[in-house]
Structure formats: structure tokens, C-alpha cells
UniProtKB/Swiss-Prot annotation:
Record protein name field: UPF0178 protein YaiI
Any one Pfam family match given in the protein's UniProt record, by short name: DUF188
UniProt cross-references to HAMAP family, sorted A to Z: UPF0178
PANTHER family: UPF0178 PROTEIN YAII (PTHR35146:SF1)
Domain of life: Bacteria
Matches recorded under InterPro entries: UPF0178 (IPR003791)
Upper taxonomic lineage: Bacteria, Pseudomonadati, Pseudomonadota, Gammaproteobacteria, Enterobacterales
Entry similarity comment: Belongs to the UPF0178 family.
Cysteine disulfide links: none
Length: 152
């Protein structure tokens, strides 16, 4: 079981939560990025550097993740592919994607893309709040408890 992070777009404060969690859980944490990352020294934390390019990091995460893994991403198509493989998916704001919710999120994403392509300014997401950080940490902990229960 591994936690995979779409690290190029992951906020640093979320990475810090993940570093601490990987140590506490003794769970492999892999940060996939097309740029160099500095991570704390740990036998549980590693980086995977990929070439720059559209969806290169996403494709590598999809290729390597397995059922039971956790993928941290705000990229909805990546989350959908991870879920199809049996992995869990969580965004940096603490929203856990499920097979039931991912279809709705994909539809909304496509709709927003259409609006932007037609010249309508849709704005971006709000900055990450303390509440978002707490929601992320709580959902990460919830996933970890599910993993422990499934192991017996």
C-alpha cells in the first residue's frame, strides 16, 4: 500500500501533513513531479521525477498505483483513473472522491472547461484555508483507519 502524490500542484502545507503521516503510519509516500522536490530524509518518503509534459506525472501515477493505494490530487481525471484501478483518491481540500461522486465532478469539470473555452471567466479556487487543511488531515486519518480495519 502506497500514498501517491501529484506533487507539482500539491500545496506545501499538505505535503507537510503527508510527510508526518507517512512517518506515523510507516507507509510509503511517493511524490511524483516534473521538477526537483526537497523532502525530509525518511525511509518512507521518496520522490519520482518524471519528464515535463502534459499529464506525464498523472500517467505515471496511474501506471504505478494499485488497488488499496491512496492518490492525492486535485486533478479530477487522474482521480477517476485511480478509482477505476481500485485506489482511493483525496484532494488537498479533504474531499474524498468516490465512484459515485467522481462522475459528477468530471461533468462539472468538463462544463467549466467549455465555459472557459467560450471566453467566460470562471475564476480559480479559493486559497487553501485552515479548515481545508483540517478536513484533509481528518480524511487522511479516516482512510488510514479503514486500511487498518481491512488488514484485520
Amino acid at each position: 500500500m502506497t500514498i501517491w502524490v501529484d506533487a507539482d500542484a500539491c500545496p506545501n502545507v499538505i505535503k507537510e501533513i503527508l510527510y508526518r503521516a507517512a512517518e506515523r503510519m510507516q507507509m510509503p509516500l511517493v511524490l511524483v513531479a516534473n521538477q526537483s522536490l526537497r523532502v525530509p530524509p525518511s525511509r518512507f518518503i521518496r520522490t519520482l521525477h518524471v519528464a515535463a509534459g502534459f499529464d506525464v506525472a498523472d500517467n505515471e501515477i496511474v501506471r504505478q498505483c494499485e488497488a488499496g493505494d491512496l492518490v492525492i490530487t486535485a486533478d479530477i481525471p487522474l482521480a477517476a483513473e485511480a478509482i477505476e484501478k481500485g485506489a482511493a483518491a483525496l484532494n488537498p481540500r479533504g474531499e474524498r472522491y468516490t465512484p459515485a461522486t467522481i462522475r459528477e465532478r468530471l461533468t462539472m469539470r468538463d462544463f467549466m472547461d467549455t465555459l472557459r473555452a467560450s471566453g467566460i471567466q470562471t475564476g480559480g479556487p479559493d486559497s487553501l484555508s485552515q479548515r481545508d487543511r483540517q478536513a484533509f488531515a481528518a480524511e487522511l486519518e479516516k482512510w488510514w483507519l479503514e486500511v487498518q480495519r481491512s488488514r484485520g
